[in-house]
Amino acid sequence: MAFSSANRPQLIRSSQKDEQFQGSLRGQAHEVCQAFAGAKKWLQWRKEIELFSDLAYYCLTTFSGYQTLGEEYVNIVQVDSSKRKVPTLFQRAALICCHTLLPYFLDKELVRLEHELQIETDGVRLSHSGLSSGSHRRSWMWKWVHRKIAALSEQQKKTLVKAVYIFRQSIAFLRRLHLATFYIKGAFYHLAKRFTGINYLRVRRSIGDDQLVNRSYTLLGAISLLHLMLLLWVQFNSFQQRQEAQQKWKVLRRMSYQRAPPHEKSYKRRAKCTLCLEVRRHCTATPCGHLFCWECITEWCNTKVECPLCREKFSAQKLVYLRHYR
């Protein structure tokens, strides 16, 4: 019996169904952790809980040689690049690592590197910060990184901070570019499957005209590419405007700080925003309890709807401006 390649709607529906079941599994894991370990431990380990939930899901399905619930839902099966054999155990393990472990560790280590650079640039170690809570038990690698960062000049540190930020944005850009390519070519929906060469075959014949569906998705891919180019141009202009606004804001802060009373100055030395690394102005709280400048956090929320420190997801409407906060 000859099998044909899975079409784009099947791959998308399969991924969406898997995400739905993974979200349900994560929610149950969060509830169990909160019930037994408390809210404090849950806040500290919630990213790791999500990681282990995803690993459990894929180990019980893909790694064990079974279809995921999403794949079973649309009647597709995994095959290797030859489309004649099922993926080997090594390929399945590599797929799970690239799909779950790699994004987690990449995001975690980049955030940590960015935080280290900001601390060194500022010259103050925030011992109570959520991101530096494990600084006293650093691994040998991070001790080496810390020594190398300490040896850099201030200008080099600032340049490296920008480079890390651009690299993180480039990862998001690459994902969107890959998605647009999928709409046009229809080969791999996830980057991890492209790296491991895992394809899909459909068990049953799909209902509908594949050529008509493919033309529709090709048009969607072209529109996505155009939108991505426009977004890149807008972000570049926005980045330049932010740089100019940041310089003006630093001048205004310096003038305000020089006019402040001595007792207010001594307090403000401790109250600094971790985004701009300047004295915190117009203090604003996120739902998770972290404090930032109003201008800094609202600007951050224009591109990312998450806390810069703990990565808790929230909408900009949830920000609380703390009037007369001392």
UniProtKB/Swiss-Prot annotation:
- The segments annotated as topological domain Cytoplasmic are 38, 123-147, 237-326
What does the similarity note say? Belongs to the pex2/pex10/pex12 family.
Natural source organism: Xenopus laevis (African clawed frog)
Which comment does the entry carry about domains? The three subunits of the retrotranslocation channel (PEX2, PEX10 and PEX12) coassemble in the membrane into a channel with an open 10 Angstrom pore. The RING-type zinc-fingers that catalyze PEX5 receptor ubiquitination are positioned above the pore on the cytosolic side of the complex.
**Superkingdom of the source species:** Eukaryota
Name of the protein: Peroxisome assembly protein 10-B
- Transmembrane stretches in the record are 8-37, 39-60, 90-122, 148-185, 217-236
What does the UniProt function comment say about this protein?
E3 ubiquitin-protein ligase component of a retrotranslocation channel required for peroxisome organization by mediating export of the PEX5 receptor from peroxisomes to the cytosol, thereby promoting PEX5 recycling. The retrotranslocation channel is composed of PEX2, PEX10 and PEX12; each subunit contributing transmembrane segments that coassemble into an open channel that specifically allows the passage of PEX5 through the peroxisomal membrane. PEX10 also regulates PEX5 recycling by acting as a E3 ubiquitin-protein ligase.
Q: Which reaction does it catalyse?
A: S-ubiquitinyl-[E2 ubiquitin-conjugating enzyme]-L-cysteine + [acceptor protein]-L-lysine = [E2 ubiquitin-conjugating enzyme]-L-cysteine + N(6)-ubiquitinyl-[acceptor protein]-L-lysine
The gene name reads pex10.L
- How is this protein organized at the quaternary level? Component of the PEX2-PEX10-PEX12 retrotranslocation channel.
The UniProt note on how this protein's activity is regulated states: The E3 ubiquitin-protein ligase activity is stimulated by PEX12.
| Segment forming the signal sequence | none
